[in-house]
């Protein structure tokens, strides 16, 4: 959790002041395409993975592109500032529940960066962080 705070403090102010953008007030009926940073590290087993996330009400469906894997879950979205937001997610992964947070910053109204923090989950390491890019579909 301390790494999330440190990364947010380092990344968000620079991105927020450099961009004239805003994050949506709600994710209901919206869809993201996310690409994790491609550099492999032992604490980033999903490096380079692209997913599509569809939100409806308090539920989401995550499709791991290039695979047949589709995972559902619940989420809570909160826009923290015009340029930053947090999504708390609980995923119903086939190997067991995964709890994670996405911290979003925008570069434009439809694109930005995210920091993924897994608090607990079935895929080792159980706690980890990585980052990537998000694109909000029109």
Question: Could you describe each region identified by the protein language model?
Answer:
Residues 19-47, 75:
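Tryptophan-anchored aromatic micro-motifs
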Residues 1-4:
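Positively charged n-region of N-terminal signal peptides that target proteins for export
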């Amino acid at each position: 959790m301390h790494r999330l705070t440190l990364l947010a403090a380092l990344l968000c102010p620079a991105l927020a002041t450099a961009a004239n953008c805003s994050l949506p007030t709600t994710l209901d009926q919206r869809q993201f395409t996310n690409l994790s940073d491609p550099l492999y590290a032992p604490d980033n087993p999903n490096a380079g993975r692209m997913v599509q996330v569809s939100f409806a009400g308090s539920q989401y469906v995550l499709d791991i592109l290039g695979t047949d894997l589709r995972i559902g879950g619940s989420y809570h979205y909160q826009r923290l500032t015009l340029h930053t937001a947090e999504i708390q997610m609980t995923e119903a992964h086939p190997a067991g529940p995964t709890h994670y947070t996405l911290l979003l910053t925008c570069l434009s109204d439809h694109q930005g960066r995210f920091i993924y923090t897994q608090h607990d989950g079935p895929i080792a390491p159980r706690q980890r962080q990585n980052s990537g890019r998000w694109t909000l579909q029109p």
